[in-house]
Amino acid sequence: LQYLHVSLWEFDKKIRRGGDTAQTRMQFIHERINGKLPLIGVGNLFTADQILAAYETGWAEFIALGKTVMINPHIATQIREGREDEIETQLDSTRTDHYGFPDTLWSSTSSGTQSWLPPVKGAEWKPMDI
C-alpha cells in the first residue's frame, strides 16, 4: 500500500461511533496510520478557502477534489493565478457545453437530484449525512 485515499461526504465530519466523537474521521485516520503512508482526503471542498483550510488541518498530506473539478476543470490554475473569485460552487444547467460531460452524466447531474453529484444552481442540494 503506497497511500490511503479517504473520500468522505464532508472532510471535517465527526466520528459517530467507535471513537472520540469530538474528533473528525479524517483526523482519527491520520493519527491511526501515524505517518506510515500518505493520506489523501476529500469531502465537499468547493472553494479555495475550504481547500486551504482542509490542507492546513494537517489531517491529510494531499487534498483531492471530486465534484469541484467537475464544476471547475481548471481549478488548480485558477487558484495558482489568484482567480479564486472565478471558482464556481454550483453547476449552471444552461451551460451544457462548458463542462464537457457525456450526455448520460449531464442528464443525471443537471437534474440536481443526486447528492453524490455537484450542486446545481437553483436546485436544492444537501450532501448525504452518512
Region roles according to the model:
Residues 1-130:
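Flavin-dependent oxidoreductase catalytic cores
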